[in-house]
């Protein structure tokens, strides 16, 4: 360890010292002693300079400032200068001088040695994009340094002047950071390593920051990162000596503990296949590098970026349904508090890091990439606070779950679809497929004692919110699959090639449409078949796949819509009169609560369709959702039904009743409803668009009442167009039913609300274990009675609804039964007052406020006391009767006047009236004036 003794300034006077010199020395000796080469020019650490002495002796400081990290480096200028001085010094290695006094050493160097030192200094300085300025004036600021930079035409990223933390004064040095190394080198060469700031020469040096040593330690038991001074693990309590595991420099915990890409998957998880690769687009090496998720921030949470502001949680869950089994508790959409729209990103949290890594790898390997509501989604690991990222081998083994099985199975379908290239989709003969994944899945499900993920299939001939098919092949040789995610999600046709015994459930396709010209005209629906239906199909292999289901609906060509740009919520203007946001580009009004648009010209509510990139009326969507089924039902009817035309207020009133019931049934439907495969199609079809259409009608009625204008909506259907059947809200179609059906369909309609075969109440959407429990539910359940009352009211006519509402209002009104009794029987006479037992003598009424107004009588207590002492009325008081005769009267004075002041009293007493007081006052003032 280096140690150098530092003396005072008076000691550094010369080579031979100042105390032993005689005063008779010649002038030549004096001039030689004061030669500049005799001075000690060693660079001692100053207050504003490097604190390297501190760092030489103590390297364990945990809190180092930024300026110390810049200066306290092994290759700093001062240390280099000392090493060169010791190298050229004849005294030998660094340490104490031989004679014990540094003043006995000759520190003078020749001119050649100084030039050699400068050359070595320039060679040893390593170029850096950070330049250090030393010997700055105390008055110099950052602006002065920036002025020097601007004068040379150089742009710096940051200029930082080091100041004292307590006083705020400059410490005499600063750092200038450049964006590129070339800029720093060019500036140093242009100024020849020196500057002139405020008339003072400033030296310039390359800064070499000291690398920070990772002093934290990892516990090899639980994987938690602990601070340096902690002697025991924060989580498991294992001592540091037993559980210490040093982190290599530049690495992180998650890079060591997390196996990705299927290289070190734990037992119980399905192996990940190779990611999908489109031929001619990417090489296998480039795709494997790009698709592998980065493990730098690996955790159990994934972030979805670039979301549509109108995307909901249902659309996100639907887009991710082919790859993972998620619920609303796994997804969190970040919304704006003011507009209630999402802020463009959402988080997906899974149970383990392994599952999150598998899902991330699947989503990043999709080609085309994942899209939700027409926008391409960027998928990454979420960057959060420090958490427990590592897990032991046993916890990773227990991380196998149904979600990871579904992820691996979905990615297996993608890899199987990509093995044969694009030509494999149209091959008439299907190549043999390896079903080891499904067999492994079956074994896992049996070991857990539950059915597999695909054991229950309930979606028949329907489009899920996040799964839509592509065009069908007219020859039946094989559908042309689309590997788009989100709205056009990954095709699951590979599941239809699986063996019967491979999995309890099976995906099946029903190709529809006669012409395969475009993917927009025809649609292909995917059906999940329950085991019972699958068994019936296997018994008759020659039967077509669609024979086990109701006849497929014929697809219809979509109507032509105008294309619009994606709505930009930031350009909307708030309208105080309507409470909506006005879109200046389209002229529509936006409702942030329902996320729908209102057209003031056509008086219609619209919603944004990301697939068609246009605004679609809400009523049109609700009617189109049931158009195909209604067409097939009308072919069996010969008579035409009458349809009622309702105003917006009436429809909004009807929808308001149903909105209340829907909100109550949502939680019951999610928690207690067990799907039944034999339910009717119209009861099973739950369209989010139709639900939004009903909710928006309620908003329309509220807007109409606020503007006090009647807005007549177009007819729900024309005479030659059938009425839409019941969908999610089965009672709304009853509003358009004929009156004849309403009269005859009361008990029959209520009977249809119960499925006795499945022991289920279709109205409450609940299934019961026995018939007695179902009957008890119908008789005693308050929820069933409430839903039944809403169902009955929904089928009433307008007159009946008005009468029922009037009756309800009368019942809710307060009934004054006392007034009814008085009107019927009259008011009874008041009872006679009770008679007193002893009748007292009626005394004359005396004004209690002025008892002495008329003077004092001889019957008062004071007069009787005086009479008892010998006083007689009319005589004065006192022993000799020399006192006053008349009693003293209280007189009023003018407020604020003294006792003896003139005009303070006008002879008015307190018992006189206002008129008498005014008269006496006038008389007194008149007498005083004379």
From Swiss-Prot:
Q: What GO annotations for molecular function exist for this entry? A: identical protein binding; miRNA binding; zinc ion binding
Q: Which InterPro entries match?
A: G_patch_dom, Nucleotide-bd_a/b_plait_sf, OCRE, RBD_domain_sf, RBM10_OCRE, RBM10_RRM2, RRM_dom, Znf_C2H2_type
Q: Where in the cell is it found?
A: Nucleus
Where does the RRM domain lie?
129-209, 300-384
Example of a GO biological process term = 3'-UTR-mediated mRNA stabilization
Give the start-end ranges of region Disordered. Answer: 1-127, 464-487, 503-522, 537-566, 620-646, 712-753, 818-861
Listed Gene3D superfamilies: 3.30.70.330, Zinc finger, RanBP2-type
Query: What PANTHER family does the annotation carry?
Result: RNA-BINDING PROTEIN (PTHR13948), RNA-BINDING PROTEIN 10 (PTHR13948:SF4)
User: What is the name of this protein?
Assistant: RNA-binding protein 10
Species assigned in the record: Mus musculus (Mouse)
């Amino acid at each position: 360890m280096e140690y150098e003794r530092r003396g005072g300034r008076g000691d550094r006077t010369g080579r031979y010292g100042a105390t032993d010199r005689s005063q008779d020395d010649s002038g030549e000796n004096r001039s030689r002693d004061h030669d500049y080469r005799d001075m000690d020019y060693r660079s001692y650490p100053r207050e504003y300079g490097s604190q390297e002495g501190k760092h030489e002796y103590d390297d364990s400081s945990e809190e180092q400032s930024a300026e110390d990290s810049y200066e306290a480096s092994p290759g700093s200028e001062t240390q280099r200068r000392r090493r060169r001085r010791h190298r050229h010094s004849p005294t030998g290695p660094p340490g104490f001088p031989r004679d014990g006094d540094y003043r006995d050493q000759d520190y003078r160097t020749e001119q050649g040695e100084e030039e050699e030192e400068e050359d070595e200094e320039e060679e040893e300085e390593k170029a850096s994009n950070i330049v250090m300025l030393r010997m700055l004036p105390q008055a110099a600021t950052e602006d002065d340094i920036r002025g020097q930079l601007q004068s040379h035409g150089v742009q710096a990223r940051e200029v930082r002047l080091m100041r004292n933390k307590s006083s705020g004064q400059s410490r005499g040095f600063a750092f200038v950071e450049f964006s590129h190394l070339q800029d720093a080198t060019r500036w140093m060469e242009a100024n020849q390593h020196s500057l002139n700031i405020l008339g003072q020469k400033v030296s310039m040096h390359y800064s070499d920051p000291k690398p920070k040593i990772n002093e934290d330690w990892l516990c090899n038991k639980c994987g938690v990162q602990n601070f340096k001074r902690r002697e025991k693990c924060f989580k498991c309590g294992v001592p540091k000596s037993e559980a210490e595991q040093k982190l290599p420099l530049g690495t992180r915990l998650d890079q060591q503990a997390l196996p990705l890409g299927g290289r070190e998957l734990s037992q119980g998880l399905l192996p990940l296949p190779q990611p999908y690769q489109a031929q001619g687009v990417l090489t296998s090496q480039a795709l494997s590098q790009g698709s592998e998720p980065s493990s730098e921030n690996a955790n159990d949470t994934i972030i979805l970026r670039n979301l549509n502001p109108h995307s909901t949680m249902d659309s996100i869950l639907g887009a991710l349904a082919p790859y993972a089994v998620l619920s609303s508790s796994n997804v969190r959409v970040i919304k704006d508090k003011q507009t209630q729209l999402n802020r463009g990103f959402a988080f997906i949290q899974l149970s383990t890091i392994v599952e999150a890594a598998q899902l991330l790898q699947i989503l990043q390997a999709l080609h085309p990439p994942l899209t939700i509501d027409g926008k391409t989604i960027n998928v990454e690991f979420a960057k959060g606070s420090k958490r427990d990222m590592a897990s032991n081998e046993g916890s990773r083994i227990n991380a196998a779950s149904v979600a990871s099985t579904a992820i691996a199975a979905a990615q297996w379908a993608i890899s199987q679809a990509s093995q044969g290239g694009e030509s494999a989709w149209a091959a008439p003969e299907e190549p043999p497929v390896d079903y080891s994944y499904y067999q492994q899945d079956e074994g896992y499900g049996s070991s857990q004692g539950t059915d597999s993920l695909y054991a229950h299939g309930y979606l028949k001939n329907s489009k899920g919110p996040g799964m839509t098919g592509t065009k069908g092949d007219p020859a039946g040789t094989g559908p042309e699959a689309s590997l788009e995610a989100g709205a056009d999600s990954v095709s699951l046709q590979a599941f239809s090639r699986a063996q019967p015994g491979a999995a309890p459930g099976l995906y099946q396709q029903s190709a529809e449409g006669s012409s395969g010209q475009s993917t927009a005209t025809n649609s292909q629906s995917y059906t999940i078949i329950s085991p019972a239906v699958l068994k019936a199909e296997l018994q008759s292999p020659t039967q077509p796949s669609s024979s086990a289901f109701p006849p497929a609906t014929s697809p219809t060509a979509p109507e032509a819509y105008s294309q619009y740009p994606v709505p930009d919520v930031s350009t909307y203007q708030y309208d105080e009169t309507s409470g909506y946001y006005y879109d200046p580009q389209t002229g529509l009004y936006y409702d942030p609560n329902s996320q729908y648009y209102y057209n003031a010209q056509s008086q219609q509510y619209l919603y944004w369709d990301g697939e068609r990139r246009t605004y679609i009326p809400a009523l049109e969507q609700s009617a189109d959702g049931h158009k195909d089924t209604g067409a097939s039902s009308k072919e069996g009817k010969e008579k035409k039904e009458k349809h009622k035309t309702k105003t917006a207020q009436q429809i909004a009133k009807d929808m308001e009743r149903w909105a209340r019931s829907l909100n109550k049934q949502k939680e019951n439907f999610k928690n207690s409803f067990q799907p039944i495969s034999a339910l009717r199609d119209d009861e099973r079809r739950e369209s989010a668009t139709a639900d939004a259409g009903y909710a928006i009608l309620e908003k329309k009625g509220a807007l109409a009442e606020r503007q006090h204008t009647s807005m007549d909506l177009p007819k729900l259907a024309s005479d030659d167009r059938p009425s839409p059947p019941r969908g999610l809200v089965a009672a709304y179609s009853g509003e358009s039913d004929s009156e004849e059906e309403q009269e005859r369909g009361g008990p029959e309609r209520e009977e249809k609300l119960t499925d006795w075969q499945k022991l289920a109440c279709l109205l409450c959407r609940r299934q019961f274990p026995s018939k007695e429990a179902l009957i008890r539910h119908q008789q005693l359940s308050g929820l069933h009675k409430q839903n039944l009352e809403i169902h009955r009211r929904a089928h009433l006519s307008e007159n009946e609804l008005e009468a029922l509402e009037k009756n309800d209002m009368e019942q809710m009104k307060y009934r004054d039964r006392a007034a009814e009794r008085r009107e019927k029987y009259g008011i009874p006479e008041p009872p006679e007052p009770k008679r007193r037992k002893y009748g007292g003598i009626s005394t004359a009424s005396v004004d209690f406020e002025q008892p002495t107004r008329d003077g004092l009588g001889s019957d008062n207590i004071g007069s009787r006391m005086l009479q008892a002492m010998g006083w007689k009325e009319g005589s004065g008081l006192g022993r000799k009767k020399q006192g006053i005769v008349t009693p003293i009267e209280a007189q009023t004075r003018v407020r604020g006047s003294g006792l003896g002041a003139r005009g303070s009293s006008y002879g008015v007493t307190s018992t006189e009236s206002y008129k008498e007081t005014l008269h006496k006052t006038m008389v007194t003032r008149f007498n005083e004036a004379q």
